[in-house]
Regions:
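N-terminal signal peptide c-region/cleavage motif recognized by signal peptidases
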Residues: 5-9
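Charge-biased low-complexity segments
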Residues: 10-155
Length: 155
């Protein structure tokens, strides 16, 4: 099981409303109540910790990293438009990396970033419906940002 360090309190986007995909779909950030993972922040933390898997390929180089997952909480609480941003490799085994060419090191870091992005997206897609945000008493779409940290569980 993956040890995950989470910055809980997924943040919403800071704009009155933002057009997504086409002009008929709005995403709001001015709302009365924020979208909530059912069960609250502790339940969200527990869900991610339980479901997030540290990629085996990253273990060979003791790689740790962080990523920001972005997604839309729709009016019905379903999640869409899932993407990964700001993937950073925070730590790796310098002895093992120094044995690789500079080009290979760069390639490996990109591979690990992609693995973290795919795993983060897998976990977000697996989430149950959220309680949607409310604006003037009506459910609205809101863009959320969820940081996830990948830590080698063997450490």
């Amino acid at each position: 099981m993956m040890l995950a360090s989470l910055t809980i309190g997924a943040a919403a986007q800071n704009a009155d409303s933002t057009r997504v995909k086409n002009d008929s779909i709005k995403v709001f950030s001015d709302y009365e109540s924020q979208p909530q993972f059912r069960g609250g922040q502790e339940a969200l933390k527990k869900f991610i910790s339980k479901n997030l898997k540290y990629p085996d390929a990253a273990a060979a180089y003791d790689v740790e990293g962080s990523i920001i997952m972005t997604f839309i909480v729709n009016e019905d609480g379903s999640l869409s438009d899932i993407s990964a941003h700001d993937c950073k490799i925070d730590r790796f085994n310098t002895t093992k990396f120094s044995q690789e060419t500079e080009a290979r090191q760069k390639e490996l870091k990109q591979q690990f970033a992609l693995l973290f992005a795919k795993e983060g997206a897998r976990v977000i897609r697996k989430m149950p419906k959220w309680a949607p945000a409310k604006r003037y008493g009506k459910a609205v779409r809101v863009k959320m940002h969820q940081p996830i940290k990948f830590i080698d569980p063997s450490k």
